[in-house]
Amino acid sequence: MNIALISTSSRKNSNSLRFANYVRHVLTETSQHDVSIVNFENYDIPFVGQGSVKKDSLTNFQQELISAWEGADLVIFAMPEYNWTAPPQATNTIHQLGGPAFKHLFENKVFAMVGISNGRGGRQPALDMTTVVNKIISFTNSYSIVSPKLYESHETDKNLDENGQFIGHEVYERTARAFIDYTLNVSQRWLAPNLVETK
């Protein structure tokens, strides 16, 4: 399975990137998956009302993001929680890529959402992004699904080191792996050949 991990924090060495690296380590324990990470450190998508993303003049960051996303069967967003909501870069990305020019990014995909916190938060950004992505899937009449299981990465900096290696409490490791397993199972069921829309 092709899997894109999208770390939506623009901070250098963010907790969201730690989590994305952790998921990559878990997924590559076997050779069953091709995994890519996109880091929002060089984010340059204009905000709605200030410009748009043009297919024929993508920046390096935009090209990296769109290439990883369009080649993926499963797209996992890792989002920091800012004041009980998702970061603006995350939702703006969906708004800017949710139109006709990039409709294919929402076709025959499984999406999964992870909220990242250095405390006990994380739920709200995952819920916010679930709502926005579901709306785009519905509005564009696309055949994709957002996996119903969210993950809240609590005390991320205490459980994962800067390279995404697990260093923390066994409950974190157990619940994170359960989320990954569940997400993979949903993806395998959703992407079964008899369910994929014939073009």
What do the predicted segments below correspond to?
Residues 19-20, 125, 129, 179:
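Hydrophobic alpha-helical membrane-association signature
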